[in-house]
Design a protein with these regions (language model features):
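FIC/Doc superfamily catalytic core
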Residues: 2-294
Length: 294
């Protein structure tokens, strides 16, 4: 039990410190559509007359001040401890299954899904659950999408193709299914309060005509290893959310990317670190930090 206690202790420490570091790096990187011109991108006028934000390609010029360097150093140190503890577990996949399920519940909850951890566990055990079937399916799809992505990573690097495949697993048979699961959007989407329009939205991502160029540059940066891994992962998460390439499911795919990149870059042997608990508890701050980058 001593080893288990140490594992959870380091996990909690790493969890909190890396979240703070990620948000700090995202915020310092570079202001969303209440936006004017920004150092992280430009406002373009679409052929239909609305304004949209097109992010610059990565990496940006970063300010390596003491706060960033200290946060990064501490996060790397704690993440290394978590990786070592995780590599010593006799059956990490069995131990991590409840955490993966919890991550799926909380990541989906950020997007409005109401299913609880207890309901998902009960449904997985074959019990009848009164919760909306769509909510249950969305969480179960998240787990399937993560499992699929991890399996593919053992054969192929992260790519636009793999991201589309993950999105297809995530959106299969649930709300948003008609929004072309597994395909990048061919129409404009936007972010804002219910009932808002393209002209009143808080944020409008790249128009369809600009989308594939943005995604091509994003894929190139996915394979760039010139930055410290945690900086790279934070920037990838931001850039994906700024591009918003799917009609639905972008937030969940973006958070899945964090876990997949941690494994792909060998920062963790398995997905031992789950950020959605922090993102859900600090949802307003999470979105604020993302908006502040653009």
């Amino acid at each position: 039990m001593g080893g288990d206690k140490k594992f959870y202790y380091y996990r909690i420490l790493t969890f909190s410190r890396i979240v703070v570091m990620l948000l700090s790096i995202i915020n310092q990187k570079l202001s969303y559509m209440d936006i004017q011109q920004s150092s992280s991108g430009q406002i373009v006028k679409s052929p239909k007359g609305y304004n949209a934000f097109v992010p610059h390609s990565l990496p940006p010029k970063l300010d390596w001040n003491n706060a960033v360097v200290n946060s990064l150093s501490r996060a790397d140190f704690l993440l290394g401890k978590l990786a070592r503890e995780g590599s010593q577990l006799p059956n990490p996949h069995l131990l991590m299954r409840p955490f993966i399920t919890r991550e799926a519940v909380l990541s989906s909850k950020i997007e409005g899904t109401q299913a609880t951890l207890g309901e998902i566990l009960a449904a997985n055990a074959g019990a009848h659950v009164k919760q909306n079937p769509d909510d249950l399916q969305e969480v179960q799809n998240y787990i399937k999408a993560l499992d699929y992505g991890l399996g593919r990573l053992s054969e192929f690097p992260l790519s636009l193709r793999l991201i589309k495949e993950i999105h297809k697993h995530l959106m299969q048979g649930v709300r948003g299914f008609l929004a072309t699961p597994g395909e990048f959007r061919r129409s404009q989407n936007w972010i804002g309060s219910p009932g808002c329009t393209l002209n009143t939205a808080k944020f409008v991502p790249p128009p369809p005509d600009n989308l594939m160029e943005c995604l091509s540059e994003f894929e190139n940066f996915l394979h760039d290893r010139s930055l410290p891994p945690l900086i790279h992962i934070a920037l990838c998460h931001y850039q994906f959310e700024a591009i918003h390439p799917f009609l639905d499911g972008n937030g969940r795919v973006g958070r899945l990317l964090i876990m997949l990149l941690l494994v792909e870059q060998r920062m963790l042997p398995t997905p031992l670190l789950y950020l959605s608990a922090f993102f859900e508890a600090s949802r307003d701050e999470y979105y604020k930090q993302l908006y502040n980058v653009s």
